[in-house]
């Protein structure tokens, strides 16, 4: 199995004047292609910091990070931004859709060149993805007219637009009611199983973690548990 994530000795230290806070303390982590993993831990455990480093939003203080075999922790800011846009997909607790853009335009947005328009091929891809997430009847609806669950499904389609190596989901169900959350989780399961998409999901919800094939537990900046469950996400 190809490793999508390979992190070695990841540390992160934040400085505030003379004060030094060690948030991550030597994280070693691999995530294989096609895995669906949940990352859990109490507030302050380092989950969000590790997710930001893997998502190339923060640089580690020490350690190395490779994604799909490519070393990324030492890339320039310009190359990090390019890699992030082209090779990673993101789903957040709050969908961050453009309210006046249609569902199709929101999905296609990551593929559009800065200052450029949306090509016919991009529109076709976006429509196909919206159909994939069950929103073929909402393609031309402005995002502001969609329900919370529908908006999060648009966000998942958007994350898939550039065929990313890895989809990073930060509390993707945290702003949804239970029924909508279950539908979003079911959709992630389908995309993971049928398309082989690799997911890393950060969550406080034990119900979400229990349905994933792997559970990573962080405590006080360390990876304290790494459990695989082949029956997860049933």
UniProtKB/Swiss-Prot annotation:
Cellular compartment(s)? Cell inner membrane
> EC?
7.6.2.-
Q: Which residues form the ABC transporter domain?
A: 5-231
Q: Which SMART domains match?
A: AAA (SM00382)
Q: What is its main location?
A: membrane
Q: Which InterPro entries match?
A: AAA+_ATPase, ABC_transporter-like_ATP-bd, ABC_transporter-like_CS, ABC_transpr_LolD-like, MacB-like_ATP-bd, P-loop_NTPase
Q: Which PROSITE patterns match?
A: ABC_TRANSPORTER_1, ABC_TRANSPORTER_2, LOLD
Record key words, sorted: ATP-binding, Cell inner membrane, Cell membrane, Membrane, Nucleotide-binding, Translocase, Transport
Briefly state the protein's biological role.
Answer: Part of the ABC transporter complex LolCDE involved in the translocation of mature outer membrane-directed lipoproteins, from the inner membrane to the periplasmic chaperone, LolA. Responsible for the formation of the LolA-lipoprotein complex in an ATP-dependent manner.
Identification of the protein by name: Lipoprotein-releasing system ATP-binding protein LolD 1
Instruction: Provide the species name.
Output: Caulobacter vibrioides (strain ATCC 19089 / CIP 103742 / CB 15) (Caulobacter crescentus)
Which gene is this protein's source? lolD1
């Amino acid at each position: 199995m190809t490793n999508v994530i390979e992190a070695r000795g990841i540390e992160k230290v934040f400085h505030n004047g003379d004060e030094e806070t060690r948030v991550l303390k030597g994280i070693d982590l691999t995530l294989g292609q096609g895995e669906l993993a949940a990352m859990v831990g109490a507030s302050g455990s380092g989950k969000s910091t590790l997710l930001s480093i893997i998502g190339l939003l923060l640089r580690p203080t020490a350690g190395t990070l490779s994604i799909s075999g490519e070393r990324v922790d030492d890339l320039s800011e310009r190359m990090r931004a390019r890699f992030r846009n082209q090779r990673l997909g993101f789903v957040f607790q709050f969908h961050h859709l453009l309210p006046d853009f249609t569902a199709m335009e929101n999905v296609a947005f990551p593929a559009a060149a800065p200052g450029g328009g949306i090509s016919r091929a991009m529109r076709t891809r976006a429509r196909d993805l919206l159909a994939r997430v069950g929103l073929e009847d909402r393609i031309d609806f402005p995002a502001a007219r969609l329900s919370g669950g529908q908006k999060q499904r648009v966000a998942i389609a958007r994350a898939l637009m550039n065929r990313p190596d890895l989809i990073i989901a930060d509390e993707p169900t945290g702003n949804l009611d239970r029924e909508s959350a279950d539908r979003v989780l079911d959709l992630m399961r389908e995309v993971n199983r049928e398309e082989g998409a690799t997911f890393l999901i950060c969550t406080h919800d034990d119900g979400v973690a229990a349905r994933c094939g792997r559970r990573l537990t962080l405590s006080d900046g360390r990876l304290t548990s790494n459990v695989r469950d082949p029956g997860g996400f049933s």
